[in-house]
């Protein structure tokens, strides 16, 4: 069949299928037909295991007129939400994704850019926050530590501004990396990211009462070594706190009582305003021989403090607008259609791994090897993926398959939904479990 006829047939089929999943999903897909490189997404709904209800596409927007809880805290006016922000999809074809990554950026006349590093302890919520800021789930998320195994890159492009998010693994010590035989990338990637950062977002999970009262030694060491890089503090998961007054105490502890170069009084801890910046010692230039006080628990050089719940997206949009406002004049690094630097195969493998971490107990998910054996286009234009999950113990195999194959089918179904929202295409995902010999 000729390419034009084939694409026309698939277009009719897929738009019809997507409309069943929801008119919003269909409209979003239709807006992506014209593309800079002449590529067209060739599929639209997702089939993975049993039938499922239509997905809800992630969105960074909120209803017009909805006030932010941080208005008084940060003094930020509400952005104009009259025009919806369109989030790019990721191509299902690796060569198309690679070509787009190296394509000349379609910059406006006065481009602005900002490279942001998300820093924090393992499982602080960095990937969840990155997904919410991007408006589409492209990074794996789970409650288990070390879900992010290496640095991942996401791109926000709005109007003249491009913000590049570097989602790094949680900072760990060399001793922990060696003791648990973790990949070297878990140790090195956060430090490498800091070398090109324009802004550091330090994320603290305030729902963890064991760690919330101080920054981890690894985070403090990183901030000290790169003290010339501006930083802000994001206190995450505040919705989990029953007593909001605890936030005042945590603010004082994590900032050592200083924000934006000014000492805070208890009643002033939640009144930092972005229009009253004062240069902090950290902004004066790099410290050639950074020395960290071993008794130090917080960082006194944060420019701003944000309190939010990344999971419910409460006030995430306010943080996003702040990041866009911090961008500096400079050339874009990517075309506006780039959402992430990950290949489609990497995204798929990460999403499957996310579900393994979520549903499998203890050490089981960490001992599963993944091998993609099929990544092809089906007869109707759908994306067909087949991945083998290799385990070394028969007991692990039984756990992964589940009673009557229910668990492996559920994983395939849920991953399929995620992949549809990422690729905006029909996906047939087949998972099989094999015992290593």
From Swiss-Prot:
Residues 146-150 are annotated as: G2. Coiled coil: none annotated. Belongs to the TRAFAC class TrmE-Era-EngA-EngB-Septin-like GTPase superfamily. Era GTPase family. NCBIfam families: small_GTP. Gene3D superfamilies: 3.30.300.20, P-loop containing nucleotide triphosphate hydrolases. It holds the Pfam family MMR_HSR1. Probable GTPase that plays a role in the mitochondrial ribosomal small subunit assembly. Specifically binds the 12S mitochondrial rRNA (12S mt-rRNA) to a 33 nucleotide section delineating the 3' terminal stem-loop region. May act as a chaperone that protects the 12S mt-rRNA on the 28S mitoribosomal subunit during ribosomal small subunit assembly. GTP binds at residues 120-127, 167-171, 236-239. The lineage of its organism: Eukaryota, Metazoa, Chordata, Craniata, Vertebrata. It is found in: Mitochondrion matrix; Mitochondrion inner membrane. Residues 264-296 are annotated as: Disordered. Residues 1-43 form a transit peptide. Residues 167-170 are annotated as: G3. Residues 112-330 form the Era-type G domain. This is GTPase Era, mitochondrial. PANTHER family: GTPASE ERA, GTPASE ERA, MITOCHONDRIAL. It comes from Bos taurus. GO terms for molecular function: GTP binding; ribosomal small subunit binding; rRNA binding. GO terms for cellular component: mitochondrial inner membrane; mitochondrial matrix. The modification Phosphoserine is found at residue 173. InterPro entries: G_ERA_dom, GTP-bd, GTPase_Era-like, KH_dom-like_a/b, KH_dom_type_2, KH_sf_prok-type, P-loop_NTPase, Small_GTP-bd. SUPFAM superfamilies: P-loop containing nucleoside triphosphate hydrolases, Prokaryotic type KH domain (KH-domain type II). The keyword Nucleotide-binding applies. Residues 236-239 are annotated as: G4.
């Amino acid at each position: 069949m000729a390419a034009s006829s084939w694409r026309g047939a698939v277009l009719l089929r897929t738009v019809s299928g997507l409309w069943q999943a929801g008119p919003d999903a269909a409209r979003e897909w239709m807006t992506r037909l014209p593309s800079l490189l002449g590529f067209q997404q060739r599929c639209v709904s997702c089939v993975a295991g049993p039938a499922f209800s239509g997905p809800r596409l992630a969105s960074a927007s909120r209803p017009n007129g909805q006030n932010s809880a941080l208005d008084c805290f940060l003094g930020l006016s509400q952005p104009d939400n009259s025009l919806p922000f369109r989030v790019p999809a990721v191509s299902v074809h690796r060569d198309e994704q690679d070509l787009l990554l190296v394509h000349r950026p379609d910059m406006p006349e006065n481009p602005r850019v900002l490279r942001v590093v998300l820093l924090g302890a393992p499982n602080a919520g960095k990937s969840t926050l990155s997904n919410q800021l991007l408006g589409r789930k492209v990074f794996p998320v789970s409650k288990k530590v070390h879900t992010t195994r290496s640095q991942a890159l996401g791109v926000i492009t709005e109007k003249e501004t491009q913000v590049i998010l570097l989602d790094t693994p949680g900072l760990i010590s060399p001793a922990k990396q060696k003791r648990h035989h973790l990949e070297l990338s878990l140790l090195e990637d956060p430090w490498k990211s800091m070398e090109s950062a324009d802004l550091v977002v330090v994320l603290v999970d305030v729902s963890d009462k064991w760690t919330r009262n101080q920054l981890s030694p690894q985070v403090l060491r990183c901030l000290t070594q790169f003290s010339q890089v501006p930083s802000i503090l994001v206190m995450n998961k505040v919705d989990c706190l029953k007593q909001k007054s605890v936030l005042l105490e945590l603010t004082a502890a994590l900032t050592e009582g200083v924000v934006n170069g000014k000492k805070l009084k208890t009643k002033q801890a939640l009144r930092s305003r972005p229009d009253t910046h004062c240069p902090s010692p950290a902004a004066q230039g790099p410290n050639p021989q950074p020395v960290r006080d071993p008794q130090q628990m917080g960082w006194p050089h944060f420019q701003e403090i944000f309190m939010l719940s990344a999971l419910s997206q409460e006030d995430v949009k306010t943080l996003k607008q702040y990041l866009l406002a911090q961008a500096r004049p400079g050339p874009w690094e990517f075309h506006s259609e780039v959402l992430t630097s990950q290949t489609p195969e990497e995204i798929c493998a990460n999403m499957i791994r996310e579900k393994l971490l979520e549903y499998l107990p203890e050490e089981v998910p960490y001992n599963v090897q993944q091998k993609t054996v099929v990544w092809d286009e089906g007869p109707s234009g759908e994306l067909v993926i087949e991945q083998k999950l290799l385990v070394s113990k028969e007991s692990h195999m039984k756990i992964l398959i589940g009673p009557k194959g229910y668990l492996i089918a559920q994983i395939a179904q849920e991953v399929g939904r995620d992949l549809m929202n990422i690729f905006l295409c029909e996906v047939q995902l087949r998972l099989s479990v094999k015992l290593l010999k």
